[in-house]
């Protein structure tokens, strides 16, 4: 018996397109393509498993662009007799994220007595085409209380996604507001809701710290004389120039963005 999503996947359940995005040519809008992926399947053979899942199967991506995982429909079927005990937890995972709570995009729990089930998730975030090609999503399956011999398959899952493929994120910049401008310094843009510890540190300071750390220990001197003097092309003496942390800090302070 093949697994199917009972109802057609409706784009309107996940995406609200404007009139311009619906009717104007793709080159005139920020939305390049709205697509529904082909079905990808995960066969759960073990009680605990973490498997790669291709949520963009059959989706044509844009080179150097982005893809937004707008929505996801998951359907499952227990390959068991009726009225079996036990259940399962299914969790979608972004394997790029190192913190466990940030890597989990959504979860669903159901009992084995419910032979067929389906649920929707709305991740609604974008990744680059380069990341998407590396198949960054996984599914964590945790089966409990099902008494079946090892090597057999108690559960099958299928995944279909609704995604937006686009070339540029420039439209998102229209939501930004200027929150602070210091005389002689760079203009910094930020969203309205930002963690305080992030907002309190100017980007220039972070850049300076990063560059200093990456260049630490790379001090060099120009010239071969031992009296802190060097010769230019005309044979005149000049002071040696030290290239290191001090000169880089000065450059960072005078840069404008």
Swiss-Prot record:
Residues 224-242 have a biased composition (Basic and acidic residues). InterPro entries: TMV_movement, Viral_movement. Residues 247-257 have a biased composition (Low complexity). It is found in: Host cytoplasm, Host cytoskeleton; Host cell junction, Host plasmodesma. Residues 212-257 are annotated as: Disordered. One of its GO terms (cellular component) is host cytoskeleton. Transports viral genome to neighboring plant cells directly through plasmosdesmata, without any budding. The movement protein allows efficient cell to cell propagation, by bypassing the host cell wall barrier. Forms a ribonucleoprotein complex with viral RNA. Binds microtubules and modulates microtubule stability. Can bind double-stranded DNA. The lineage of its organism: Viruses, Riboviria, Orthornavirae, Kitrinoviricota, Alsuviricetes. Belongs to the tobamovirus movement protein family. One of its GO terms (molecular function) is RNA binding. This is Movement protein. Keywords: Host cell junction, Host cytoplasm, Host cytoskeleton, RNA-binding, Transport, Viral movement protein. Signal peptide: none annotated. One of its GO terms (biological process) is transport of virus in host, cell to cell. The gene is MP. It holds the Pfam family MP.
């Amino acid at each position: 018996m093949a697994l199917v999503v009972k109802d057609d996947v409706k784009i309107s359940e996940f995406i609200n397109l404007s009139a311009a995005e619906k009717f104007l040519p793709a080159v005139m809008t920020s939305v390049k393509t709205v697509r529904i992926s082909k079905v990808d399947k995960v066969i759960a053979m073990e009680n605990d498993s973490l498997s790669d899942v291709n949520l963009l199967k059959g989706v044509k991506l844009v080179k150097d662009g982005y893809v937004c995982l707008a929505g996801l429909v998951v359907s499952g079927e227990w390959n068991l007799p009726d009225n079996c005990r036990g259940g399962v937890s299914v969790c979608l995972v972004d394997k790029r994220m190192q913190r466990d709570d940030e890597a989990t995009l959504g979860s669903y729990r159901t009992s084995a007595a419910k032979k067929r089930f389906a649920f929707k998730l709305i991740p609604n975030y974008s990744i680059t085409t380069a990341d998407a090609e590396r198949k960054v999503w996984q599914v964590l399956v945790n089966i409990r209380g099902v008494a079946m011999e090892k090597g057999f398959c108690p559960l099958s899952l299928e995944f279909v996604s609704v995604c937006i493929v686009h070339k540029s994120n420039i439209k998102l910049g229209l939501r930004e507001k200027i929150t602070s401008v210091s005389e002689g310094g760079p203009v910094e843009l930020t969203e309205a809701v930002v963690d305080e510890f992030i907002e309190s540190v100017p980007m220039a300071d972070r850049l300076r710290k990063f560059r200093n750390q990456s260049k630490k220990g790379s001090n060099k001197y120009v010239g071969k004389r031992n009296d802190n003097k060097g010769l230019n092309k005309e044979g005149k003496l000049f002071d040696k120039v030290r290239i290191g942390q001090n000169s880089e800090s000065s450059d960072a302070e005078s840069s404008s963005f």
